[in-house]
Amino acid sequence: MDITTTEIYHDDHHTPHGWKRWLFSTNHKDIGIMYIIFAVFAGIVGGLFSLLFRLELAMPGGTFLNHDFQLYNVLITAHAVIMVFFMIMPALFGGFGNYFVPLLIGAPDMAFPRLNNISFWLLVTAFILLMGSAFVDGGPGTGWTLYPPLSNLSGHPGAAVDMAIFSLHLTGLSSILGSINLIVTIFNMRAPGMGLFKMPLFVWSILVTAFLIILAMPVLGGAITMLLTDRNFGTNFFKPDGGGDPVLFQHLFWFFGHPEVYIVILPGFGIVSQVISTFSRKPIFGYQGMVGAMVIIGFVGFIVWAHHMFTVGLSYNALIYFTAGTMIIAVPTGIKIFSWIATMWGGSITFPTPMLFSIGFIILFTIGGVTGIILSNSALDRVLHDTYYVVAHFHYTMSLGALFTAFAGFYYWFGKISGKQYPEILGKIHFWITFIGVNLTFFPQHFLGLAGMPRRIPDYPEAFAGWNMVSSIGAGISMAAALYFVFIVFYTLKYGKDCPNNPWGDGADTLEWTLTSPPPFHTFETPPHIEG
């Protein structure tokens, strides 16, 4: 190949066209966009499932689902698994992580582009398997926790739970491969001059999350494989009549399950740090403290799992340890909350939609954190365990908290991804509808839990009817807000104004704002040099 043809070859971006561009893509931006589109689709499906069982719970009597309480449990299971594994993780970790980590560190792409492709398509396959399981033998009505004996052959004799287990295996594999890719990218492909402590906090949050996934996911894989062999190959890991112990499954599941909570929320912490710094026009307060807080949250998150199991008969010493350990997690989390507030303090603050969602996140996450401190007390948890108080707590933290950070990131970066800037008034309307809807849904559930209403039941005494109706109305408003969000996306893509390279002004000082909107197919082929 002579010099002229080489130059021509390098001058062309060789962007593939049509469906092959997406199916075979190894470009981190295309794969990030596919993750985000998939997450929005899965979120709508999971949200519709929750609306169905909120309609069932709107009034006592169990009439909406025609007394099909197995279907109710299948909806609960599918809603939880979809929202955790197919909505929040693909949006925050897969979507924004894939798209923006290489841009934020000045890398040309991810370290392993083909691995990136299979990570995404494994997730789609897992989603199809999970949806299919709902139509097999009555569906998996176990809850997302898959506790035996309900998930054993005695509780679910058909193939539904086996399909759900394979779905979880595939989504776990997808997450692990994506994590390896991101860790290698962050450690090996930073631009010259960008030390670890010059990286934006979003990159740090993805790095910590990736390590959590690699350490936690194999434990889930082991637990559900043992469950699979109990169901199909005559082992007795969790069958008491064969010398097994169902509580062992709970230990294994929650050793994964509690770090999973931080896997869900940590990338959101990173997004909020970027957004608040940008719109306060100040560097983040206590950068190294914020990094340290994330690392400590990740570490302590692994050693408090049994606070999900305070009522299974743990020893007195174990109760003391897990109560104290759980309360300690509030310290690094508090460091982050107060650092965000300190960043805003004295800043030149503006309030576009991403900033509203970030402030909404701080409010919601703080409410959820306070109820978490109450639940961390094993004595109080004896009363509150498996009531709607717990439902309210974890929705305020990992659900609403993570959702609001995802919306903050979406509005913050949508112009950069698409080249079209959303109309600010539409974004603000979306924020207020969502904020009112989710609070109307979940705040009354604190009262229901304190009054003694248990989780995972399709019918209830009339004493609980009032707040359940309020909660169901809130769910309807929240679903309307989600559909309105989809409308905003399509409206912006069709009628939105062209987005400048940096729509946010001086506060946005990370590398992605030096590129065009949308960025070219290949970026940073010559690495930028970071100074200062």
Swiss-Prot record:
InterPro entries registered for this protein in UniProt? Cyt_c_oxase-like_su1_dom, Cyt_c_oxase-like_su1_sf, Cyt_C_Oxase_1, Cyt_c_Oxase_su1_BS, Cyt_c_oxase_su1_dom, Cyt_c_oxidase_su1_bac
**Positions bound to heme a3:** H393
Name of the top EC class for this enzyme: translocase
Source species taxonomy: Bacteria, Pseudomonadati, Pseudomonadota, Alphaproteobacteria, Rickettsiales
- Catalysed reactions, semicolon-separated: 4 Fe(II)-[cytochrome c] + O2 + 8 H(+)(in) = 4 Fe(III)-[cytochrome c] + 2 H2O + 4 H(+)(out)
Role played: Cytochrome c oxidase is the component of the respiratory chain that catalyzes the reduction of oxygen to water. Subunits 1-3 form the functional core of the enzyme complex. CO I is the catalytic subunit of the enzyme. Electrons originating in cytochrome c are transferred via the copper A center of subunit 2 and heme A of subunit 1 to the bimetallic center formed by heme A3 and copper B.
Asked if Transmembrane is a keyword of the record, the answer is yes
What would be the name of the gene that encodes this protein?
ctaD
Q: Identify one Pfam family in the record.
A: COX1
Q: Give the GO cellular component terms, alphabetically.
A: plasma membrane; respiratory chain complex IV
> Where can this protein be found?
Cell membrane
Membrane topology field: Multi-pass membrane protein
Q: What's the protein name?
A: Probable cytochrome c oxidase subunit 1
Enzyme Commission number(s) of this protein: 7.1.1.9
Q: Which GO terms describe its molecular function?
A: cytochrome-c oxidase activity; heme binding; metal ion binding
Q: Which is a GO BP term held by this UniProt record?
A: respiratory electron transport chain
Q: Which keywords does the record carry? A: Cell membrane, Copper, Electron transport, Heme, Iron, Membrane, Metal-binding, Respiratory chain, Translocase, Transmembrane, Transmembrane helix, Transport
Span of the signal peptide: none
The answer to whether UniProt assigns keyword Ion transport to this entry is: no
Main localization of the protein described in the UniProt heading: membrane
